[in-house]
Amino acid sequence: MRSKNQEQLLLLSISAAMAALSVVFTRFLGFSAEGTPFRFEIGFLPIAIAAYAAGPFYSAAAYCTADVIGSFFSGYAPNPWISMAQVLSGILMGVFFKRKHSLPRAVICFSIIAVFVEILIKSPVFVYMYSWTWGFTFTTRTINALINLPIRIFIYYFTLKAIKKPLDQLL
C-alpha cells in the first residue's frame, strides 16, 4: 500500500513522462502542412494514457505542459488559447477515461474533443492568428477532425487494451 504522497508522486511522474512523450509524438513524429490548419499526430495518446492513470487534473496539466514545451521546439512562443484548448482536452479525457476503458467512452470523448475543441474552439484562434477566412478555417479544421477522429479512437482503444493490465498493476 502506498502513502498518499507516494501515490501523488507516482501520478505526477506518469503525467510528466507522458507529457514528454507527447512532445516527441507531436513535434517530431507529427505532420503539419505548412500554411494550413491541418495536423496529423499522435501526441494525444500519451495524454490519454495519463488521463486513464491519473485523471483530469494530471492529464490537463500534462497536455498544457506538452503544448508549451512543444511550441518552443517549433520555433514560436506558446499560444495561451491553444494551450487552454489542450487543457480542456486533457480534462475531458480525464473525466471519460480515469481507470475506465471502453470503446463507447473513447468514441464519445474523442467526438466531443473533435467538435468542441478542435473545430469550435481552435478555429477562431487560427482565424485570428493567421488571418484565414472563417470558411477556409472551419472547413479545413472539420476535415482535419473527421480524419483524425477514427484514427484517435482506434489508436487509443487498442493501445490501452494492450497496456491496461501492466498499467493497472503499476497503479
Mark where each language-model region is.
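Loop-helix junctions at membrane interfaces
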Residues: 1-171
